[in-house]
UniProtKB/Swiss-Prot annotation:
Its EC number is 6.1.1.3. This is Threonine--tRNA ligase. Binds 1 zinc ion per subunit. GO terms for biological process: threonyl-tRNA aminoacylation. The keyword Glycoprotein does not apply.
């Protein structure tokens, strides 16, 4: 007999060499029908797994988040099975689960059409309803290669040949389809019910551009219809909010081939950019930061000394001049260390909080560029805190408080925190890492955050905190970071004089709240759907006249507003007032000020806020006071 321990603490005895399914069925027949996989001693396994020894066992159903990846992997196999039935000449390659779905790569001469996708999805529904049993098979390596070659699946044969000797070759069979896979999988195709094929794209075999191009079918799959519907609605809403689309409609920015990944900021977009920079500058000054400016072009010798040349060389733009190699900086940190090193620093100078809106360049692959979200030229709200070890906790708490205030001002209150601890390869000794990790954990808790652990995901030079925002339609964006660094001060010989009189290395905290301003503006455009709050809107007040004889008064009002720092637009054309209001509303201007004869006579305007039909009559002074009050909360 073997002892099986369950999550509730109970222990049950079963005969040796029993399958996981038999155990589940013995507990509950209804649970056996719902079970997808089991977790045995922390590892996910098929229900067909034979259990020979005592173990801890957890039964997972569609209600457990771990099963979502299983369902998506099942859906990838279902897609491949459907493609092989409809297009038997097609070769299958790989099909993993990914975030929000899966993909499968196919080798086929003729491209898949939109109609083909619809037919494949219909065939998948048919195969799902058949509820074909999914079984795991262990094959001899040579036999597996011979089998796949015999059915014309040359890519599968190549994959098997690349698997290290000694590793088992496992295949999964469902109906007439068989695929190479590690698993685990659901017991049958009937567990895959809620899915949709999304698109077809090109993909190189093995991700290498020197290899042949394959066709990649992307799909999404979920545990329930409600989850699928919610996801599809989110995608539809995201398309409406796409910052590239809104950016064009509101005349904020553009890109062009002659400067790939570089933003052409238009007047209105640049207004948003400068307002955010002004806001952040005010915040950091209040929090004791100094602001600096460092060179954009720096000799490669500094990047070699810092270690960035070895790691980021391929992502850096370089040029040769006067027999020297210069690089456009991809980040600001080595330059900030150079400022820290100017003059002798004492423990009394710490913590030194050094900020910069630093212009950085990164040679991103052209295929990775995506509007404002992924660019080659970017400015970060970057700062580095040089401090003593005993100051780490207080500085981290202080930063977390500042970050929370900033996110709240932009409308983000759902903040998730991820903590990355040391990997197997790390600089420094365990004692230093223990202190650093404990200091950051204590600080996160003091700041009121609950964090999830990313085991082993820290950089080699220190532990890291990541801050993830959730937007209006449920998407998550990693923006803020705090990265502890023991290595760079050592590499670049930064030190300070401690109270004891000895030289010590400062700890360096790399921190950002927004990340890159370009990306954060892209996030804000989509968060607000272009409807910026008054303080941030590129045009705060739009003036519209009812008749042409009011134009002089309207221009006088505009001048008064501009003189008082109000960002203003005006339409004194002969167009109808309803047309003017509609046009300004389409431009998502937060306040429209209408001027008629009565408003002129009383030195007033009638305002209407975006998204409402309510009107309010204000004097020019009252309107200015309202805007200034709104601005003063942030600027």
């Amino acid at each position: 007999m073997i002892n099986i321990s369950f999550p509730d603490g109970s222990v049950k005895q079963f005969a040796q060499n029993i399958t996981a399914f038999e155990i589940v069925n013995a507990i509950s027949m209804s649970l056996a029908k719902a079970a997808i996989v089991v977790e045995i001693n922390g590892e996910l396994k098929d229900l067909s797994t034979v259990i020979e020894n005592d173990c801890k066992l957890r039964i997972l159903t569609a209600q457990d988040y771990e099963c979502l990846e299983i369902i998506r992997h099942d859906a990838a196999h279902l897609t491949a099975e459907a493609v092989k039935e409809l297009f038997p000449e097609t070769q299958v390659t790989i099909g993993p689960a990914i975030e929000n779905g899966y993909y499968y790569d196919f080798a086929r001469d003729k491209p898949f059409s939109i109609d083909d996708l619809a037919n494949i999805e219909a065939k998948m529904q048919e195969l799902s309803k058949k509820n074909e049993k999914i079984t795991r098979e262990l094959w001899d390596r040579d036999k597996a290669v011979e089998f796949f070659l015999s059915i014309g699946e040359h890519y599968k044969a190549k994959i098997i040949a690349s698997i290290p000797e000694g590793e088992p070759i496992t295949l999964y069979r469902q109906g007439n389809f068989i695929d190479l896979c590690r698993g685990p999988h659901s017991p049958s195709t009937g567990f895959v019910k809620h899915f949709k094929l999304m698109k077809v794209a090109g993909a190189y075999w093995r991700g290498n551009s020197r290899n042949e191009m394959l066709q990649r079918i992307y799909g999404t799959a979920w545990a329930t219809k409600e989850q699928l519907d919610n996801y599809l609605f989110m995608l539809e809403e995201a398309e409406k909010r796409d910052h590239r689309k809104i950016g064009k409609e509101l005349d904020l920015f553009h890109f062009q081939e002659e400067a790939q990944g570089m933003v052409f900021w238009h007047d209105k977009g640049w207004s948003i950019y400068n307002t955010i920079e002004q806001y952040i500058r005010k915040k950091i000054r209040k929090n004791g930061y100094i602001e600096v400016k460092t060179p954009v072009l720096v000799d490669k010798s500094l990047w070699e000394a810092s270690g960035h040349w070895a790691k980021f060389r391929c992502d850096m733009f370089t040029l040769e001049t006067d027999d020297k190699t210069l690089a456009l900086k991809p980040m600001n940190c080595p330059c900030h260390v150079q400022i820290f090193k100017q003059g002798i620093k004492s423990y009394r100078d710490l913590p030194l909080r050094m900020s910069e809106f630093g212009l950085c360049h990164r040679n991103e692959a052209s295929g990775a560029l995506h509007g404002l979200m992924r660019v080659r030229s970017l400015v970060q709200d970057d700062a580095h805190i040089f401090c003593a070890e005993e100051q780490i906790t207080d500085e981290t708490v202080r930063f977390c408080k500042l970050l929370t205030e900033v996110y709240k001002d932009f409308g983000f209150t759902d903040i998730k925190v991820k903590f990355s601890d040391r990997s197997e390869i790390c600089a420094g000794n365990d004692e230093v890492w223990d202190k650093a990790e404990n200091a950051l954990k204590t600080a996160i808790e003091k700041a009121g955050f609950i964090y999830t652990l990313n085991p082993g995901e820290a950089a080699f030079y220190g532990p890291k905190i990541e801050f993830v925002l959730t937007d209006a339609i449920g998407r998550q964006w990693q923006c803020g970071t705090l990265q502890m660094d023991f290595v760079l001060p050592e590499r670049l010989d930064a030190n300070y004089i401690a109270a004891s009189g000895e030289k010590k290395r400062p700890v360096m905290l790399h921190r950002a709240i927004l990340g890159s301003l370009e990306r954060f503006i892209g996030i804000l455009i989509e968060e607000y759907a272009g409807k910026f709050p008054i303080w941030l809107a590129p045009v705060q007040v739009a003036i519209a006249t009812i008749t042409n004889d009011l134009n002089d008064y309207a221009l006088e009002v505009q001048k008064t507003l501009i003189d008082n720092g109000v960002r203003t637009d005006i339409n004194i054309s002969p167009d109808k007032i309803n047309y003017k209001i509609r046009e300004f509303s389409n431009q998502k201007i937060p306040i429209i000020a209408v001027i008629g004869k009565q408003e002129q006579a009383n030195k007033q305007v009638t305002i209407r806020k975006l998204g409402t039909i309510e009107q309010e009559i204000l004097s020019i002074e009252q309107l200015i006071a309202m805007i200034k009050k709104e601005n003063s909360n942030y600027l």
